Curated annotation (Swiss-Prot):
Organism: Rhizobium meliloti (strain 1021) (Ensifer meliloti)
Subcellular location as annotated: Cell inner membrane
Co-factor requirement: Zn(2+)
Protein name stated in the entry: Putative zinc metalloprotease R01501
Family per similarity comment: Belongs to the peptidase M50B family.
Length: 374
């Protein structure tokens, strides 16, 4: 808790800036595609609850900032609420010539595009930020060549030796030493097969990463898998790779994809009990990390913003009603059936989805409190 309080002058402004930026970009994706699709937009809100300030534009859209800055929404004509729950009863009261401007009255592909645009905007923002960082600062890399093997580690037991070059893990190519850490960290106590190159010959070595608790440079505890190898300048050839604009965009997309796959790996292992759920954090932990990044500099803040943007985009694509992914799931069913899911079924699904999101929020908050006072 002292770490959070010590960084308070950095934490609050940085957290609010990041949250406002990411929410604004996400909702702007919905807004722009909705407008392009001819759907009337009633409100664009950053935050929930009572309005702090705002204005109404010439199209009749109310732009506002609200008291609780933990999200946002775009309210379309014909929506029942901020979650874009369809209001079928109200639709019947709208004049036929106006129904085409409601969200519910728009063509299926326009609704799907409008909903998908929010997460896509988050992914595009992340790619852009990573591209800028790679263009300016480059990317620190090291070859996947072993310099030392920890005693009694999974690697030592499997027969890994200094000088071995890692070629692949479970058939996935390894290009840098960081690729090893990224793949192994989310697979504690899960058997893997590491292919190494030794004196020109490829050798497959089965091993099981050990579950370890480590502390990152910022003081945050984390549980991860490790096989017990390291590298150094002589073996790994530490260097900074620089990229032109187009290469940087490609690297930005690749980095975003790595975050997506790493998150999905973590969630799948969490589901089967291989990873601890206490690493699921909420606003308090994000705020604390925001303050830590701010103390390190603008590059770290931007990198953190990109990571959060990918996470928000991915979270919203989860097939849970009330989230964007839940809406897209309904549209997929509608496309297959040739007609929408019935209002009663949708209403029940939205209630269940809301309960799931609420439980996740409470769980993350509980983890934050335990972390704060632990």
């Amino acid at each position: 808790m002292s770490l959070l309080l010590d960084n308070l002058q950095y934490t609050i402004p940085t957290f609010l800036f990041l949250l406002t930026l990411l929410v604004f970009v996400h909702e702007m994706g919905h807004y722009l595609v909705g407008r392009w699709s001819g759907i009337r937009i009633l409100a664009f809100s950053v935050g929930f609850g009572p309005e702090l300030f705002g204005w109404t534009d010439r199209h009749g859209t109310r732009w506002k900032f609200c008291a609780v800055p933990l999200g946002g929404y775009v309210k379309f004509f014909g929506d029942e609420d901020a979650a874009s729950t369809p209001d079928y009863r109200r639709l019947e009261t709208i004049a036929p010539e106006e129904r085409g401007r409601t969200f519910l009255g728009a063509k299926l592909w326009k609704r799907a595009a409008t909903v998908a645009a929010g997460p896509i905007a988050n992914f595009l923002l992340a790619i852009a930020i990573f591209a800028v960082l790679f263009s300016i600062y480059g990317r620190a890399v090291a070859d996947p060549v072993v310099a030392f093997v920890a005693p009694d580690s999974a690697a030592e037991k499997a027969g890994v030796l200094p000088g071995d070059r890692l070629l692949s893990i479970d058939g996935k190519p390894i290009a840098t030493f960081d690729d090893v850490r990224r793949y192994v960290s989310v697979r504690p106590e899960l058997p893997i097969t590491v292919r190494i190159e030794r004196e020109g010959a490829a050798i497959d070595l089965p091993m099981v990463p050990q579950r370890t608790e480590s502390v990152d440079p910022l003081g945050n505890k984390m549980e991860e898998g490790k096989i017990g190898i390291g590298t150094n300048q002589e073996a790994g050839n530490f260097r900074v790779e620089t990229y032109g604009p187009l290469e940087a965009v490609g690297q930005g997309a690749l980095q975003s994809w790595r975050i997506v796959t790493g998150t999905l790996d973590y969630l799948s292992n969490l589901f089967v009990g291989r990873m601890s759920a206490d690493q699921v954090g909420g606003p308090i932990r994000i705020a604390q990390m925001s303050g830590q990044m701010a103390k390190l500099g603008i590059a770290e803040v931007l990198n953190f913003a990109a990571v959060l943007s990918v996470s928000i985009g991915l979270l919203n694509l989860m097939p849970v009603p009330v989230l964007d992914g839940g809406h897209l799931m309904f549209y997929a069913v509608e496309a297959l059936r040739g007609r929408p899911v019935g209002p009663a079924a949708q209403d029940l699904a939205f209630r269940i989805g809301f309960a799931m999101v609420l439980m996740l929020t409470v769980f993350a908050a509980w983890n934050d409190i335990n972390w704060l006072f632990g």
